[in-house]
Amino acid sequence: NAEQSSKLITPLINGTTYYFRVGAVDTSKNVSPLTLEANASPIKGAVYTVKTDTSGDYSDIQSAINATQDIDTVLIYPGTYQGGINYTGKKIVVGSLFLTTGDTAYIDSTIIDGDASSSVATFISGEDSTAVLTGLTLTNGYTTITGGGGIRIENSSPRLKNLKILNSVANVGGGGISCEACDSRITDVVIANNSVTGIGGGMRMFNGSNPELLGVTVSNNTSTLNGGGIAYEGLPASTIEQRLHRVTVSGNRSSEGVGGGIYLYSSIATVTRSFIQDNAASLKGGGLSIEWASELTLENSFVSGNALTNGVQ
């Protein structure tokens, strides 16, 4: 009956995907060997749809964001949308139909193109973990003065998940992502083919940042200076521990610096169940460069095939 087959689960977080396995139990408490797996993502508040034609609430993403209030959702249908977006401090969820279906094909088919004129996504107004960006491809961002060709985060901590951040450029730091004073949780994100003339081809974390990386792939990014893949720049005598779990750092290059894969400067990092492979640096530390009182713990991880020092400096 309905009472026995219904289950109220609370509290749930807006924009978070929950996974369930449903089975049957008979009157003798025997559990059926057959189960049904399902996933769901709760959506609170109003939902604003964005479509490339005129059939949605809006045809451009920023207009939809501007119309939202806290806890609302912007649901983006497949297509390519030109121009960067800015959350402007709002506690909202922005995502593709991946958000409602769990179908990863929507990540590839729903694209925000930065027009090589700005960061593709910007979080600089104190956004916290209730600001979520999910299920999208971000590409063709470009910044000259600030970092973060793909995503710029400053004094904010949005949640980033199930994204692809591709082919973006920065002149300062963080071709893919620049994270300044942020504590973001970054999950199942691909950061690839980005570049920077400064530090951190894929990602740059600095000024007290402490993001958590889970299931992140950082590949084929390039930097002129240090950290072709990822650059961590801690504050002097920093005790903040950077956490990387199930991360793949591969094929990244530092053309005139150190740390082709990962560069640590005055930083503490723990890397677990990860791969650091086939990266290269022109000076030293093809896979990893650890400088200025940095500490690194590697657990159940592989470091191999890196150029110059074949791994750790």
Task: Give the role of each language-model region.
Residues 20-21:
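Hydrophobic beta-strand segments within extracellular beta-sandwich modules
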Residues 46, 72, 83, 90-92, ...:
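The right-handed parallel beta-helix/beta-solenoid scaffold, focusing on the short coil/turn
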Residues 53-58, 62, 70-93, 97-99:
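N-terminal extracellular ligand-recognition/capping segment immediately after the signal peptide
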Residues 54, 91-146:
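Right-handed parallel beta-helix/beta-spiral solenoid domain characteristic of secreted/periplasmic
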Residues 73, 95-96, 109, 130-140, ...:
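Right-handed parallel beta-helix
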Residues 109-124, 144-152, 170-179, 196-206, ...:
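Extracellular beta-strand/beta-solenoid scaffold signature
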